[in-house]
């Protein structure tokens, strides 16, 4: 019997690998078109020069690259836009100008201050089977697919949080209605043992994992700089990863996300999280943990209010703290309305971008890059997929105890992408504002971005009684509520 089961598992594994090759092949770059590939505000083409060492060692930009080939949009003196779009006003372009030389690895170790760079609607569906992705999606070392090596190095340096298994049990809720809030597949999985807690988040934790990814990369930029690449400052990277260990002692562990979700967001253990609940957890956990890092969340509206933002970023009226802006929104009913394609793509081209969590039917991904499509007016968005179950990331009081395999499990060089028309409209968008100059550049960017705006910045928060607000705000972008039943975002 055991051999039969093992044989069936092998057949299933290889069968799924074949399906992956047919239906979800590794994306390749067109060297003739050589369209720029973007990763969180940095632009890459095949002309981008880079000196690559072996994996795990430093990857350093050549001097030819630093000035004009690998650059955030601000360094090109232009507002991020799609190639067919018209340029915005000269004032907006000027507002985005900044230093053209990326920090050296040594400078990246200093407290980061970068002036030109950084920083619902959910109904539990049947869970997406994580084994489809986890058995094959990232096991093989991919070739470069014609992509700029500097782009792949940047992509690989983004922190990637995934499903984990074998961690300390997360107790089940004693509320009799808790099981009804889970997806049907999760109810089947947990039916056999109603008493045991959750030792894996496979099938329900993908939105939490993409939220962790967004937060981790924000902290990475604050601590090590946007130009940090794998192999640089390994001790600092281990310290950062320890904050996200799968253990209640780690401040950003899945245990603490679930605990806050249960206490403040009405989310039971084992229940999927939506973008709004994830934003509230990030806000609470980060503000309780970090001394010089703040989180500003817009709630369920796309409006950013300058007076409220400054109360978070500069509470004493003098010292500006790096601040993560979280915007939970919905840009359509079943699919993203095409009027938002340009502006949503441009958010990933902004130098303050720290990515998008959510945004795929029946699952959540962490989107970090974009490339214009050759076939139409849309774009392909590059993402990190959390649906890949790995052993739990342990907690160590001494981060030096993390092994290379522990660190490697939080990175991947394998690209995944989807067309923007395939995205789910429910998402969490993040921007990291490092200082006041960065804040003013970001305001100008979102004001002049191409396409229908998905973000509005106003001076005063009407809830404070200092202004009447914008009556049209509610009509401009559909809002997000975790209790709305139109959109499926599952783990």
Curated annotation (Swiss-Prot):
Its EC number is 3.4.22.-. Disulfide bonds: none annotated. It is found in: Cytoplasm; Nucleus; Preautophagosomal structure. One of its GO terms (biological process) is protein transport. GO terms for molecular function: cysteine-type endopeptidase activity; protein-phosphatidylethanolamide deconjugating activity. Induction: Expressed throughout growth and development. The active site is at residues 206, 385, 387. GO terms for cellular component: nucleus; phagophore assembly site. Keywords: Autophagy, Cytoplasm, Hydrolase, Nucleus, Protease, Protein transport, Thiol protease, Transport, Ubl conjugation pathway. Residues 53-137, 457-491 are annotated as: Disordered. InterPro entries: Papain-like_cys_pep_sf (IPR038765), Peptidase_C54 (IPR005078), Peptidase_C54_cat (IPR046792). Residues 475-491 have a biased composition (Acidic residues). It comes from the Eukaryota. Residues 126-135 have a biased composition (Low complexity). It catalyses: [protein]-C-terminal L-amino acid-glycyl-phosphatidylethanolamide + H2O = [protein]-C-terminal L-amino acid-glycine + a 1,2-diacyl-sn-glycero-3-phosphoethanolamine. Residues 61-72 have a biased composition (Polar residues). Belongs to the peptidase C54 family. Cysteine protease that plays a key role in cytoplasm to vacuole transport (Cvt) and autophagy by mediating both proteolytic activation and delipidation of ATG8. Required for selective autophagic degradation of the nucleus (nucleophagy) as well as for mitophagy which contributes to regulate mitochondrial quantity and quality by eliminating the mitochondria to a basal level to fulfill cellular energy requirements and preventing excess ROS production. The protease activity is required for proteolytic activation of ATG8: cleaves the C-terminal amino acid of ATG8 to reveal a C-terminal glycine. Interacts with ATG8. This is Cysteine protease ATG4. It comes from Pyricularia oryzae (strain 70-15 / ATCC MYA-4617 / FGSC 8958) (Rice blast fungus). The gene is ATG4.
């Amino acid at each position: 019997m055991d051999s039969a089961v093992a044989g069936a598992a092998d057949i299933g594994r290889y069968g799924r690998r074949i399906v992956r090759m047919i239906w979800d092949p590794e994306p390749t770059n067109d060297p003739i078109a050589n369209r720029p590939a973007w990763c969180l505000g940095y632009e890459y083409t095949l002309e981008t020069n880079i000196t690559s060492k072996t994996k795990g060692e430093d990857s350093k930009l050549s001097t030819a690259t630093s000035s004009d080939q690998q650059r955030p949009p601000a360094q090109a003196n232009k507002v991020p836009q799609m190639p067919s779009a018209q340029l915005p006003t000269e004032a907006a372009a000027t507002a985005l100008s900044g230093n053209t030389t990326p920090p050296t690895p040594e400078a990246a170790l200093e407290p980061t201050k970068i002036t030109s760079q950084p920083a619902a609607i959910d109904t539990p569906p049947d869970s997406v089977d994580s084994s489809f992705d986890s058995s094959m999606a990232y096991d093989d070392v991919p070739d470069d697919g014609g992509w700029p090596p500097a782009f792949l190095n940047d992509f690989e340096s983004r922190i990637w949080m995934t499903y984990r298994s074998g961690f300390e049990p997360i107790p089940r809720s004693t509320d009799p209605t808790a099981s009804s809030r889970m997806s049907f597949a999760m109810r089947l999985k947990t039916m056999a043992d109603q008493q045991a807690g959750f030792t894996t988040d496979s099938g329900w934790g993908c939105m939490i994992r993409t939220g962790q990814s967004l937060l981790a990369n924000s902290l990475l930029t604050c601590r090590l700089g946007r130009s940090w690449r794998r192999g640089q400052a390994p001790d600092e990277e281990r310290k950062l990863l320890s904050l996200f260990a799968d253990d209640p002692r780690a401040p950003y562990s899945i245990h603490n996300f679930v605990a806050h979700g249960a206490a403040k967001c009405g989310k039971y253990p084992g229940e999927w999280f939506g973008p709004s609940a994830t934003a509230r957890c990030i806000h609470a956990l980060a503000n309780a943990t970090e001394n010089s890092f703040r989180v500003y969340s817009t709630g369920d509206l796309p409006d950013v209010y300058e007076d409220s933002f400054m109360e978070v970023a500069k509470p004493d009226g003098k010292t500006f703290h790096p601040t993560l802006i979280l915007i939970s929104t919905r840009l359509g009913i079943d699919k993203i309305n095409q009027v938002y394609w340009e502006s949503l793509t441009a958010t990933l081209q902004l130098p303050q971008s720290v990515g998008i969590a959510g945004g795929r039917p029946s699952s959540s991904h962490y989107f970090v890059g974009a490339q214009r499509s050759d076939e139409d007016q849309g774009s392909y968005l590059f993402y990190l997929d959390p649906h890949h179950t790995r052993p739990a990331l342990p907690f160590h009081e001494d981060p030096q105890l993390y092994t290379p395999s522990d660190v490697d499990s939080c990175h991947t060089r394998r690209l995944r992408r989807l067309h923007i028309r395939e995205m789910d409209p429910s998402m969490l968008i993040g921007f990291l504002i490092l200082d006041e100059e960065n804040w003013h550049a970001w305001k100008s960017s979102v004001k002049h971005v191409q396409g229908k705006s998905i973000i509005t910045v106003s001076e005063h928060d009407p809830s404070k009684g200092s202004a009447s607000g914008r009556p049209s705000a509610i009509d401009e972008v559909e809002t997000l509520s975790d209790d709305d039943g139109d959109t499926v975002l599952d783990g």
